[in-house]
Each structure stands twice: as structure tokens, then as C-alpha cells.
């Protein structure tokens, strides 16, 4: 029976290799992209005011603003010009208006009046509003790319352009 002794140099080299492998694995795994948290509320389909299909899941993993509005709401009318400007100034953020409680003609007139050059959906039956538990208009959901969101609903005042701009800027910072 022969006894084999490991030299101190070989043991040291093996230790260095083990540490190097651990460091590579640790930093390699730390930099692995994380999956975006799925928001079940985005699992809806709808029709835009121009009649095109829309899939809510297309917003997953992107900064986005959902704006719940009606054409007869005074606060929605007050917010619309700001939304038009803030959306135009933030092309990295997807804006989607979700209109209800009116006929399509009134919705389309509202979009035209305020030059809302972003997607607006016809939610005449209120299904999307119900998914988000929106009790009244106007309301917003601000989505960050990681899937987290903030719901804002103030039935007593329109959101100021400064507040809207700040909330939108935070989605991409």
C-alpha cells in the first residue's frame, strides 16, 4: 500500500482554481438578466378606437402609462393636453388610453380634439377598467419595465403636467 502525499504547491493551486471558478460563477450569475414579473392584468385583448386589435400583453416588460378616461369627464378634459405633450416628449414610454362610458364617436372626437397620438382603446363594456378595479375616472397605472406598477386615482382633481412628467420620467430612470 502506498501513501500519496499532496504537495503544498498542488494544494494551493487547486484552491486558487476553486476560488476562481466560484468568483466566475458568482459574478456571471449576478449579471444574468432577471425575468420580468408578469402582471395578470395585462392579459387582455381590446380594440383601438380605429378598429385595430390590441393585446395588453404587448406592454409586458416595457415602461408604460395606462390612462383611464371618459370624454365627458372634466378632469379628463383638463389632463388630455398634458398627456398629449408628455407622451410626445417620452417616446421610450408607451402610452395607452382606455376609454369607456361613451359611444365610439364621442371617444374619437375627444382623441382628435386633444391630438392624442397614442393608442386609445374602446372599453365600452368596462372589462379592462374592472381588471384594474378603476372606480372612477381619471385614473393612471404607471408600469416600470420590471413589471412593477403604481395606481393613481384622484376623482377630485386633474393630475398636473409637472406631476405627470415626473411620474413618467421615473419609469425610465
Curated annotation (Swiss-Prot):
PROSITE patterns: THIOREDOXIN_2. Disulfide bonds join 73-76. InterPro entries: AhpC/TSA, Thioredoxin-like_sf, Thioredoxin_domain, Thioredoxin_ResA/DsbE_sf. GO terms for biological process: cell redox homeostasis. Keywords: Disulfide bond, Redox-active center, Secreted, Signal. Gene3D superfamilies: Glutaredoxin. The keyword Secreted applies. CDD domains: TlpA_like_ScsD_MtbDsbE (cd03011). It comes from the Bacteria. The keyword Disulfide bond applies. Residues 1-38 form the signal peptide. One of its GO terms (molecular function) is oxidoreductase activity. It holds the Pfam family AhpC-TSA. It is found in: Secreted. SUPFAM superfamilies: Thioredoxin-like. GO terms for cellular component: extracellular region. Disulfide oxidoreductase that catalyzes the oxidation of reduced, unfolded secreted proteins to form disulfide bonds. Despite a weak homology to thioredoxin this cannot serve as a substrate for thioredoxin reductase. Belongs to the thioredoxin family. This is Soluble secreted antigen MPT53.
